[in-house]
Structures are given as structure tokens and as C-alpha cells.
């Protein structure tokens, strides 16, 4: 009886023990009748090179990459797709006959999320909170689709750098500002979509929000990249004020669905993956 899968896939990062990716990816493989297995690989920075080098010998067909390796892993990859190159970070690797290609599905996953929720960036004004890795991907998605973008970050230089680097060709439609009370109030008075890409709302910062409830209103769409908890303080406040809310789990599943499609050349069963991710997240809370 066969016990070895046709190919291995996995998530490399540190830590990865509570990831919902194995549940949703293995369910998708099973649904599509693919004899593949998805595992988590806890690897510290000093172990990264050896893990990437082992992809060929261990028949690892693809990897997702998470914190803290998204930038460092580029050193060990043969080529990058255009989005990953522009963003300067990789979260998906495919092993193509021994050559490793890096992708960034944070970018494409956010585009899919917008499409799924019928948000047309070209007609919208976005305020992005934070200027880290995921913010770079989201900024690129908004700018590529013609959206107006304001980036707010604690360090003004980072906000200005992101706004300028990602959206040079959209002169007059982008700005980067320090995240303070005055700039936040002015930006949100003239925005349609808020996207939180900071850790405020999770971990030690759970129960906190960067946005005072008085600045939220019913005509806003509020997206939080955080998926645990599913409903952050920001989303709770926005919902109470009548705004439309979208949590980070949907964003994560769209990113995972794109990785699945890159690896398999098959359409990802998004609804199934979403259901399995929700179940895994509930299980992690026990």
C-alpha cells in the first residue's frame, strides 16, 4: 500500500505551529484528488538556507514563506515573478525541475479579495495603516488598479518611501504621512477603504485599535490584515458604526488559494479552503 505522497509542500517560518495553512491546503489537495501533503517547517534564520537547499532532494514541490524569512529567502531563489520583485518579498516558492521561482501572493490575494467583495480600487480612496511587508504588497495592488492611496505609519520616512516607491506613476494620487491624530482624522475624512497592516489588535495589542470609533462611519469599508482574532477591536468598532468589515482570514485564504494554483495549475476550491481555515482557527483557540 502506498504511503509516500507524490509531492510535499509546506510552510516555512518561525514560529509556525498554529498556522491554519496545512488544514486548508491539505483539504484542497484532497478535494482535487491530488496525492500531495502540506506540512509546517519551523526554521530559524540560520536554518533557512539548508531548508531551501533540501527542496530538491526531499521532493518538496513548493513552499509558503512567512515571518521572518520573506525577504531573506530571496538570496536562495533562482528567479522572481514581477510582483515579488517590485515588493521585495516572497511568500510562495515553486520548485520547477530544480529551479526555484519566488512569488508574492500577498499582492494577488489582495486583488482577489477586492474583486470578490466588489471593491473597484479605481473608484476608491484607500488609507493604509502601516508600512511593513504586507503593506507593500497591498499598496502595489491598490496603485496598479488605479486607486488613490494614503499611507500612515509611525515613522513618516517609511510612509513616504512606500507611497513614493510603489506609486510613482500615479502622481498626485498618493501620499505618505506620519501616523498621528491629526493626519489620521484628515485622511479618514476623505477615504472609502481603511486597511490595517499593523499588529495593533493582535497578541499583546489585542483589544486595541489605532482608529477612534468617532472617525468610523457607515459608508466605509474596513479591512484588517489580522486574522486572529477574527474580529479585532477595529472591526468591532467599525461594525457598530455600520461600516462594512472584512477580516484577515479571507485575505489569508485568497493568498493560499493563489499559492495552490501556482503549484497545481488547478483552480483552488476557495470556499472549502475558507471553511477549513475557520475550523482550524477555532481548534487553535481550544
UniProtKB/Swiss-Prot annotation:
Pfam families: SDH_C (PF18317), Shikimate_dh_N (PF08501). It comes from the Bacteria. Homodimer. The active site is at residue 70. Signal peptide: none annotated. GO terms for biological process: amino acid biosynthetic process; aromatic amino acid family biosynthetic process; chorismate biosynthetic process; shikimate metabolic process. Involved in the biosynthesis of the chorismate, which leads to the biosynthesis of aromatic amino acids. Catalyzes the reversible NADPH linked reduction of 3-dehydroshikimate (DHSA) to yield shikimate (SA). Belongs to the shikimate dehydrogenase family. NADP(+) binds at residues 130-134, 225, 248. InterPro entries: Aminoacid_DH-like_N_sf, NAD(P)-bd_dom_sf, SDH_C, Shikimate_DH, Shikimate_DH-bd_N, Shikimate_DH_fam. This is Shikimate dehydrogenase (NADP(+)). Disulfide bonds: none annotated. Pathway: Metabolic intermediate biosynthesis; chorismate biosynthesis; chorismate from D-erythrose 4-phosphate and phosphoenolpyruvate: step 4/7. Keywords: Amino-acid biosynthesis, Aromatic amino acid biosynthesis, NADP, Oxidoreductase. It catalyses: shikimate + NADP(+) = 3-dehydroshikimate + NADPH + H(+). GO terms for molecular function: NADP binding; shikimate 3-dehydrogenase (NADP+) activity. It comes from Dehalococcoides mccartyi (strain ATCC BAA-2266 / KCTC 15142 / 195) (Dehalococcoides ethenogenes (strain 195)). The keyword rRNA-binding does not apply. Its EC number is 1.1.1.25. The keyword Membrane does not apply. Shikimate binds at residues 19-21, 66, 91, 106, 227.
Amino acid at each position: 500500500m502506498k504511503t509516500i505522497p507524490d509531492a510535499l509542500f509546506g510552510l516555512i517560518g518561525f514560529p509556525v505551529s498554529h498556522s491554519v495553512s496545512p488544514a486548508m491546503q491539505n483539504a484542497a489537495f484532497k478535494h482535487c484528488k491530488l496525492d500531495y501533503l502540506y506540512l509546517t517547517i519551523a526554521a530559524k534564520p540560520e536554518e533557512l538556507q539548508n531548508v531551501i537547499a533540501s527542496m530538491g532532494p526531499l521532493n518538496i514541490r513548493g513552499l509558503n514563506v512567512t515571518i521572518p524569512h520573506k525577504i531573506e529567502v530571496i538570496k536562495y531563489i533562482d528567479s522572481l515573478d514581477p510582483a515579488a520583485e517590485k515588493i521585495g518579498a516572497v511568500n510562495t516558492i515553486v520548485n520547477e525541475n530544480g529551479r526555484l521561482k519566488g512569488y508574492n501572493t500577498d499582492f494577488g490575494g489582495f486583488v482577489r479579495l477586492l474583486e470578490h467583495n466588489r471593491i473597484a480600487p479605481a473608484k476608491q480612496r484607500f488609507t493604509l495603516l502601516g508600512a511593513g511587508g504586507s503593506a507593500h504588497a497591498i499598496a502595489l495592488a491598490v496603485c496598479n488598479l488605479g486607486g488613490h492611496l494614503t499611507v500612515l505609519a509611525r515613522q513618516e520616512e517609511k510612509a513616504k518611501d512606500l507611497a513614493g516607491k510603489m506609486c510613482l506613476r500615479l502622481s498626485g494620487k498618493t501620499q505618505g504621512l506620519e501616523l498621528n491624530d491629526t493626519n489620521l482624522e484628515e485622511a479618514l475624512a476623505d477615504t472609502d477603504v481603511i486597511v490595517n497592516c499593523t499588529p495593533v489588535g493582535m497578541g499583546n495589542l489585542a483589544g486595541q485599535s489605532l482608529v477612534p470609533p468617532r472617525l468610523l462611519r457607515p459608508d466605509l469599508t474596513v479591512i484588517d490584515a489580522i486574522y486572529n482574532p477574527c474580529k479585532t477591536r477595529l472591526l468591532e468598532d467599525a461594525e457598530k458604526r455600520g461600516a462594512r468589515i472584512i477580516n484577515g482570514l479571507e485575505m489569508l485564504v485568497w493568498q493560499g488559494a493563489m499559492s495552490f494554483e501556482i503549484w497545481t495549475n488547478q483552480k483552488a476550491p476557495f470556499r472549502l479552503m475558507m471553511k477549513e481555515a475557520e475550523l482550524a482557527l477555532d481548534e487553535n483557540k481550544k
